C-alpha cells in the first residue's frame, strides 16, 4: 500500500483523497437524512431546504474559486460549468421536493442520488474539461434519473406515460450527436448504474408490490424500456468511443452492487440499517475505477473534445 502511494503524484493523491472524502460526505448526508426522517419531528421541507442550500453554496464556492485560480480557462467553459452546476441543483431540488416523505419506498430512492452527486462533483471540479458532449450526456442522465420519480406522481393524468416516451425519444435523437465525440465521455459511466437501478427496480415493483395498480405497472414497464434504451445507447457508444476495460469493470461492479443492494432496499431497510455500509464499500470501488478513467483521459490530453 505504501509503495502504491509513493508512486502517485501529489495531484493523483489529492484526487483519491477528494474522492474518498466526497464518498463519505455523500453517504453521511443520506444516512443522516434518513435517520432524521425516521426519528424526529423535523419536517421534510426543512431538511430539503438545508441540504439544497448547502449544495448550491458548495457549487457557487467551487465555481468562483476555480474562476480565480485558473485564469486560462475560457469563459465559455466557465459559463457551461455554471449551467451544469445550477441545473444539477435545480434537478436535485425538484426531485427531492416531489418525494413523499411518508413512503418508505420513496425515501429509499433518495439513496439513488449518489451517481447524480458524483457527476455534480466532477463537473464542478473539472470545468476546463466540460464540453457540449458532456452537457448533453448530463441532460440524458437527468432524464434517466428523474423518470424513476415522476410517473408515480402523474400516473392518474397520463403524464407519466408521456414523460417516459419523451425520454426514450430524447435518447435516440441524441445518439447521432454523441457519436461525434472523439474522446471518451466519462460521465456516461454513470448511466450504467441508472440502468440497472431502473431495470431491476421495475422487476421487483411489478412482481412483488400488490398495491401497485395496472397503470402503475404499465408505467414501470415503460421505465424498464427506457432503461434498456439507455443501455443499448451505452453499448453503441462503447463501440464508437472505444471504451477500455475499466468501463466494463465499473459496469460489472454496478450489476453486482445492485443485485445485493436492491433486496435490502425493499425488504430489510426497516429492520436493518447496516446495508448502508455495503453501499459505501461498493462506492469506494466505483470511485476507484471512475477516477482511474478520468486520470487516463487527462493524461492522454483528449479533454473530451
Task: Provide a role label for each language-model segment.
Residues 46-49, 53, 96-127, 167, ...:
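Specific alpha-helical transmembrane segments that line the substrate/conduction pathway
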Residues 26-28, 66-105, 228-244:
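Specific transmembrane alpha-helical segments of multi-pass solute transporters/efflux pumps
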Amino acid at each position: 500500500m505504501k509503495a502504491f502511494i509513493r508512486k502517485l503524484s501529489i495531484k493523483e493523491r489529492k484526487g483519491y483523497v477528494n474522492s474518498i472524502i466526497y464518498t463519505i460526505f455523500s453517504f453521511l448526508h443520506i444516512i443522516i437524512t434518513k435517520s432524521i426522517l425516521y426519528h424526529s419531528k423535523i419536517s421534510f421541507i426543512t431538511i430539503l431546504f438545508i441540504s439544497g442550500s448547502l449544495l448550491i453554496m458548495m457549487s457557487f464556492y467551487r465555481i468562483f474559486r476555480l474562476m480565480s485560480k485558473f485564469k486560462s480557462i475560457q469563459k465559455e467553459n466557465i459559463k457551461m460549468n455554471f449551467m451544469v452546476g445550477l441545473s444539477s441543483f435545480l434537478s436535485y431540488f425538484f426531485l427531492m421536493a416531489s418525494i413523499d416523505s411518508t413512503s418508505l419506498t420513496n425515501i429509499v430512492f433518495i439513496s439513488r442520488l449518489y451517481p447524480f452527486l458524483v457527476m455534480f462533483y466532477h463537473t464542478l471540479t473539472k470545468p476546463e474539461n466540460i464540453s457540449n458532449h458532456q452537457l448533453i450526456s448530463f441532460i440524458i442522465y437527468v432524464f434517466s434519473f428523474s423518470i424513476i420519480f415522476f410517473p408515480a406522481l402523474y400516473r392518474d393524468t397520463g403524464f407519466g406515460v408521456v414523460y417516459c416516451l419523451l425520454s426514450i425519444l430524447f435518447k435516440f435523437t441524441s445518439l447521432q450527436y454523441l457519436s461525434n465525440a472523439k474522446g471518451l465521455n466519462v460521465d456516461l459511466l454513470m448511466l450504467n448504474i441508472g440502468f440497472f437501478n431502473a431495470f431491476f427496480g421495475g422487476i421487483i415493483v411489478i412482481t412483488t408490490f400488490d398495491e401497485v395498480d395496472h397503470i402503475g405497472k404499465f408505467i414501470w414497464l415503460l421505465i424498464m424500456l427506457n432503461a434498456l434504451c439507455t443501455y443499448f445507447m451505452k453499448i453503441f457508444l462503447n463501440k464508437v468511443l472505444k471504451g477500455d476495460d475499466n468501463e466494463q469493470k465499473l459496469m460489472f461492479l454496478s450489476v453486482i452492487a445492485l443485485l445485493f443492494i436492491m433486496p435490502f432496499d425493499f425488504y430489510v431497510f426497516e429492520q436493518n440499517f447496516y446495508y448502508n455500509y455495503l453501499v459505501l464499500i461498493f462506492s469506494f470501488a466505483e470511485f476507484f475505477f471512475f477516477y482511474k478513467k478520468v486520470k487516463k483521459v487527462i493524461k492522454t490530453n483528449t479533454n473530451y473534445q
